[in-house]
């Protein structure tokens, strides 16, 4: 399967290492880089994580904007300027930079949330709060999916 699914909570050690779920690593197995690209989410207080193929899609979308627009500059700064490549070690772990951990409020545990083409890393309690909000929105907007095909 080529999508990120499910939710996992893994511990973060004192060296800021955390294990990426095995099925997430399997989705990324076709990538040229043995790791992930992570950047601060511009939607939520979490870390967005993807492979190089998704970063290329974002690059193409951003390049459609006026090269001198505030929007393009902001997206380039927040996504590309803040992005880091994180290699997997032999145990499938990545080292989370302190700047990303601070953005997401992550300390001892990290909650991995599959979002299809990306996954997010949250502070677990913050994700539980967001999950309640997302459930309400999904319930209210459920009929929009019927017309999405």
Curated annotation (Swiss-Prot):
Alphabetized UniProt keyword annotations: Cytoplasm, DNA-binding, Repeat, Transcription, Transcription regulation
Coiled-coil portions: none
Source superkingdom: Bacteria
PANTHER family in UniProt: TRANSCRIPTIONAL REGULATOR MRAZ
Assembly with partners or alone: Forms oligomers.
UniProt-listed HAMAP family: MraZ (MF_01008)
Name used for this protein in its record: Transcriptional regulator MraZ
The species this protein was found in: Rickettsia prowazekii (strain Madrid E)
């Amino acid at each position: 399967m080529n999508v990120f699914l499910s939710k996992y909570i893994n511990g973060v050690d004192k060296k800021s290492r955390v294990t990426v779920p095995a099925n997430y690593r399997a989705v990324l197995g076709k990538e040229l880089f043995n790791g992930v690209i992570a950047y601060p989410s511009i939607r939520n207080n979490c870390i967005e994580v993807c492979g190089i193929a998704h970063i290329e899609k974002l690059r193409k979308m951003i390049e459609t904007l006026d090269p001198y627009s505030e929007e393009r500059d902001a997206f380039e700064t927040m996504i590309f300027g803040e992005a880091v490549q994180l290699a997997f070690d032999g145990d499938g772990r990545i080292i989370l930079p302190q700047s990303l951990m601070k953005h997401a409020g992550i300390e001892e545990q990290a909650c991995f949330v599959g979002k299809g083409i990306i996954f997010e890393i949250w502070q677990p309690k913050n994700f539980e709060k967001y999950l309640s909000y997302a459930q309400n929105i999904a319930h209210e907007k459920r009929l929009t999916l019927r017309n999405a095909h």
